[in-house]
């Protein structure tokens, strides 16, 4: 039986948990699996580092089967969960001034072309890969992400505690935004949307270096927003919130949407976020000036029974997207393609 290596460049806590689950599941099926992390490769030049990592991975491969979470040109199965490089370029009109962007595009193309199978986390990314790289549809499988579902939800007590902690009005609904990349996930658009929303408590959570700029923007527009850094445990914010808005410019699939749904938040995002594929049309923001969405949000803020009804529906919806289901689907694709 062929040995499997799971490759990752930048190991985060979230990725590490997924990698361990995948490794253990493959071990239980009789595969010998190791996790290779290349974050310890040192280089002052990020371009040199990226090239060096890919060369080293290729040299080490021999007869191993590579499952890659990052872009490696020696990938057998590529888990394309971070979006498409050529799409990110469109968000930055000066992308050509960043040499690393060019190298990443080259490696991405090789990764896509050389891999046996690609697993995307949304049909948005699937369509983009098929279009940009002229990939045959049967080479790509879409598997939506999964989350650990909450064991209990007590929105009332969670809201009371958070409002007391932040010194905000308990009687007002909470509208939440969560991201560590404010530009990509639309913090600007979120703040602008708030200017059309009836009175509510607005909270932005995230570790973004540009936070002071967004604070100033909110102040200039006369919008009261509470900014908080990303906490170790964020679930209590989802549990306390009524509405979650993520007007992404581009995101392959924000798991924040799943987490918010699981705690009964009413969620809105754009069609440029793969997570929109699991939402009904009325919850998809079509443009930055989408009056239908702002009117709907204002309706929700004034109709508590409607809000409770949709909240219950969203909790039920989230139960379709568990880490167990996600892992089982990925294992099935691996088993069908390993040689």
PLM feature segments, named:
Residues 101, 113-156:
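Donor nucleotide-sugar binding/catalytic pocket of nucleotide-sugar-dependent glycosyltransferases
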Residues 147-148, 178-182, 201-214:
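Glycosyltransferase donor-sugar binding loop
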Residues 282-291, 299-304:
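Conserved acidic donor-binding segment of nucleotide-sugar-dependent glycosyltransferases
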Residues 153-168, 234:
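A short helix/loop element that forms part of the nucleotide-sugar donor recognition site in Leloir-type
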Residues 17-24, 173-196, 212:
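A conserved mid-protein helix/loop that constitutes part of the nucleotide-sugar donor-binding site
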Residues 249:
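Aromatic "clamp/platform" in nucleotide-sugar-dependent glycosyltransferases that forms part
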């Amino acid at each position: 039986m062929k040995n499997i290596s799971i490759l990752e460049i930048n190991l985060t806590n979230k990725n590490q948990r997924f990698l361990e689950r995948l490794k253990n599941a493959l071990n239980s099926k009789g595969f010998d699996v190791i996790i290779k992390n290349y974050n310890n490769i040192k280089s002052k030049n990020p371009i040199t580092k990226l090239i060096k990592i890919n060369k080293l991975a290729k040299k080490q491969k021999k007869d191993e089967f590579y499952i890659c979470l990052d872009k490696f040109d020696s990938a057998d199965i590529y888990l394309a969960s971070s979006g498409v490089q050529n799409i990110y370029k469109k968000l930055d009109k000066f992308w050509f001034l960043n040499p690393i962007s060019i190298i990443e595009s080259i490696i991405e193309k090789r990764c896509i072309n050389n891999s046996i199978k690609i697993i995307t986390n949304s049909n948005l990314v699937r369509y983009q890969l098929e279009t940009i790289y002229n990939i045959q549809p049967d080479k790509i499988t879409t598997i939506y992400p999964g989350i650990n579902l909450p064991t209990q939800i007590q929105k009332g007590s969670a809201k009371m505690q958070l409002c007391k902690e932040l010194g905000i009005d308990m009687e007002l609904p909470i509208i939440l935004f969560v991201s560590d990349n404010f530009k990509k996930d639309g913090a600007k658009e979120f703040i602008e949307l708030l200017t059309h929303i009836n009175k509510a408590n607005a909270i932005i959570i995230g570790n973004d270096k540009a936070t002071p700029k967004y604070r100033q923007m909110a102040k200039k527009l006369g919008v009261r927003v509470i900014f908080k850094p990303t906490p170790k445990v964020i679930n209590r914010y989802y549990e306390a919130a009524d509405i979650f808005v993520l007007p992404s410019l581009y995101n392959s699939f924000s798991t924040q949407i799943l987490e918010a749904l699981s705690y009964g938040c009413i969620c809105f995002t754009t069609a440029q976020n793969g997570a929109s594929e699991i939402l009904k049309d009325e919850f998809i923001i079509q443009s930055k000036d989408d009056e239908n969405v702002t009117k709907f949000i204002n309706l929700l803020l004034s109709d508590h029974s409607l809000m409770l009804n949709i909240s219950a529906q969203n909790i039920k919806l989230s139960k379709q997207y568990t880490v167990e289901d996600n892992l089982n689907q990925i294992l099935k694709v691996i088993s069908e393609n390993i040689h």
